[in-house]
Curated annotation (Swiss-Prot):
<dbReference type="Pfam" id="PF00533">
    <property type="entry name" value="BRCT"/>
</dbReference>
<feature type="binding site">
    <location>
        <begin position="81"/>
        <end position="82"/>
    </location>
    <ligand>
        <name>NAD(+)</name>
    </ligand>
</feature>
<dbReference type="Pfam" id="PF03120">
    <property type="entry name" value="DNA_ligase_OB"/>
</dbReference>
<keyword id="KW-0479">Metal-binding</keyword>
<keyword id="KW-0235">DNA replication</keyword>
<dbReference type="InterPro" id="IPR018239">
    <property type="entry name" value="DNA_ligase_AS"/>
</dbReference>
<dbReference type="Pfam" id="PF01653">
    <property type="entry name" value="DNA_ligase_aden"/>
</dbReference>
<keyword id="KW-0234">DNA repair</keyword>
<keyword id="KW-0436">Ligase</keyword>
<protein>
    <recommendedName>
        <fullName>DNA ligase</fullName>
        <ecNumber>6.5.1.2</ecNumber>
    </recommendedName>
</protein>
<feature type="binding site">
    <location>
        <position position="170"/>
    </location>
    <ligand>
        <name>NAD(+)</name>
    </ligand>
</feature>
<feature type="binding site">
    <location>
        <position position="133"/>
    </location>
    <ligand>
        <name>NAD(+)</name>
    </ligand>
</feature>
<keyword id="KW-0464">Manganese</keyword>
<feature type="active site" description="N6-AMP-lysine intermediate">
    <location>
        <position position="112"/>
    </location>
</feature>
<dbReference type="InterPro" id="IPR004149">
    <property type="entry name" value="Znf_DNAligase_C4"/>
</dbReference>
<dbReference type="InterPro" id="IPR036420">
    <property type="entry name" value="BRCT_dom_sf"/>
</dbReference>
<comment type="similarity">
    <text>Belongs to the NAD-dependent DNA ligase family. LigA subfamily.</text>
</comment>
Amino acid sequence: MHAIQTEMDQLTHTINQHNIRYYVDDAPSIPDAEYDRLIKRLTELEGDYPQFKSVDSPTQRVGGIALQKFAQITHLKPMLSLDNAFEQADFAAFNKRITDKVDNVDYVCEPKLDGLAVSITYRFGVLERAATRGDGSVGEDITANVRTIRSIPLKLRGEGFPDLVEVRGEVFMPKAAFEVLNQRQISKGDKVFVNPRNAAAGSLRQLDSKITASRALGFYAYALGVVEGESQPMQTSHYGQLTQLQQWGVPVSSEVKVTDSLEKVYAYYADIMARRSALEYEIDGVVIKVNDIAKQQTLGFVAKAPRWAIAYKFPAQEEMTLLESVDFQVGRTGAVTPVARLKPIFVGGVTVSNATLHNADEIARLGVKIGDTVIIRRAGDVIPQIVAIVPEKRPDDAQDIIFPQHCPVCQSIVERLEGEAVARCSGGLFCEAQRKEAIKHFASRKALNIDGMGDKIVEQLIDKELVKTPADLFSLTASSVTMLDRMAMKSATNIVAAIKQAKTTTLARFLYSLGIREVGEATAANLAQHFTEFERIRTASVEQLLEVADVGDIVAKHIRQFFSQPHNIEVIDQLLEAGITWPVIEQADESQLSLKGQTWVLTGTLTQLNRNDAKAQLQALGAKVAGSVSKNTDCLVAGEAAGSKLAKAEELGVKVIDEQALMDLLNAAN
C-alpha cells in the first residue's frame, strides 16, 4: 500500500475514533486544537491525493454542492407518529390498555427530543441515504446534509451488523449551539430563529449542505427501522436494540432508562421534568415504549400510531398577557376563525403574539373581551391557546367581540349551520381567501398534482389577478406566468406544461381536488367507484349518497350542499370545458365483485405496482382495504420488508399472500 494512503487511512480511523469517544461515549480523548490539526492534515492530503479518499472520511462533513431541490424518498416502512398523554390519568389509561393484553410489561423511558425525526439507512455498514419523516410515507432526501452531522457515523463500527440497517432518530440543535447561531444571525443582520427546533429543521433542510455543516446539530437514535440480512440474531428488546446501535457507533441518549412499574415511570417523568432546563437540548416530554419487541408486535398499531408507545407530554407552560384586538380569518372551506392579537409574551420557549379563539361558542364560554388580560397556554407545547381571563384586571373600556355577519374578505353572508360550532363564509370560490386555499388544494400532490405549482406561485397568481378559480389555471400562458416575481420563461413554460398534463386525471382525484368538506382521498375514491360517473355524483340525493361506503349523514349533506351552489357548478363546468378528463370507470356487475364483503390489508413495499393502484384494484373487486390487521381481516398482502402487520396476521391466523399472488389474482380478474 502507498505510504500516503496508509497515512490517510490511519488519520481517518483516528479521527472517527475520536468522534465516537466524543459523540457516542461522551468521553473526549484529545483537545479540540489537536482534533483540528488532524482534520487539517487529512484535508490537505485528500486534496493532493483524491484517489485515496475513504468513503467514511470525516472531511465529508463539511458539505458539498448545493442542490436545486430535495428528491423524494419513500420510507421502507411508514414513520408513524405517537399518541399523546397530557396527564397522569391519560398514561394510566394507556397502561391499562397494555396490561389488559400482555403481562409482565417493562417500559423504556426516553426524553422526547424537540427536533426533527429522520431515517438513516446503512447498507453493508456504510451510510447510504437519509430522509426526513415527511408525511410518514414519503420524506425528503437529506443524505448530503446528514453526512455533515459529526455525531452520525458515516460507517458503522465493529462487526455483526445486518446487510441493511435503518436507524430512526431525532436531529436537534443543542441549546448552547442555538444561542451561538442566533448571535451570529444578529451580527449579520439576519432573522433569528424562534427556538432550537426551528433552527434544527431549518438547518437540516438547507439545499446547500455547507450551511448545514456550519451549524452544530446533534443526533440521538430512538429506534431501529427496517433490518435485512442479519448475520446474527437481533436483540429482542427495544433497550437491547438501542444498546446494539451504540455498539455500532450510533449515539443514543444517556437518559434512556428501563422501568418495571407504573410508579417508576412516574418517577422518571418527574425527575427529567425537574431537570429539563439543565439538559443540553430542548425536550417537551417523555416517550414511553413497551420494551419487549414480541409484545410490541402483539399490541400492533392503530391507523397512524403504535399501540405500544405514547408521548407523555409535559404540562403546558402558561403566562398572562393583554388581548389587544381580534381579527377574523377565512380558511379554505370558508370557516371564519377569530384570532386574538396579543401583546407579545414569551411562553413555552417561543414568543406568542397570536392565539385562536376557535369560534363564537368559545368566545362566549371564556367570556373574553378586547382589553382583557388573558392566560395563554401552549397546549402540548405547540398551539397557543387562551384558557381563561383574569376578571379582576378587566378595564372599564373592555369591548365585546362581535362575530361578523358578513365575510371580512368578500362581504358574503356568514352562515352557521344547525349543530355546527363553526361559522362559514357562503361566498365559496367568489371569496378570495377561500380561493387561494382552494387553488392550492386543487393543485396539490394528492389532487391534480400540478408539478411546480407551489403555494407562493398560487398566491402570486391570485394577487396579480391572473387566476380567480381553478379553471383559470388552464387559460394561463407562459408569457402571462412570467409576470410573477423571479419567473423566467423556461420555468413559466414548465408550469404551463404541467398544468396541461394535469388535465388527464382520475375521477377520484378530480372529486378530491374540488375541496368538498369532509371528502378526503378515501371518500372520493369510494364515491367514484360507487357512482362511476361524475354527473351521477353531482346530482345524487342525500339518500343516494348514504349508500356509499364510509359516507355518513354529515358528509352526504356537505356533498349535496357543495353541488347545490351555483358558483361551484359554474367552476366545475369551466373545468370540464377546459378539457379535464379521466378514464371511464366500468360498473362491475355483482358476478365480477369476487372480493365483495372481504377486508384486505396491504403491508410492506410493493414493487410491481404502487400501493394506491393496488388498493384501487382491490376496491374495484368489491374489497374493503383497511389500514390495520384485526380478526375481521380476510387477507393480508405482504410486500417486501413487511413488519408488525405480518406478525399480527400470523398470530390471528389471517390468510397471507405475497405480491406475486396478488398480481395473479388481479390479472385473472381483469
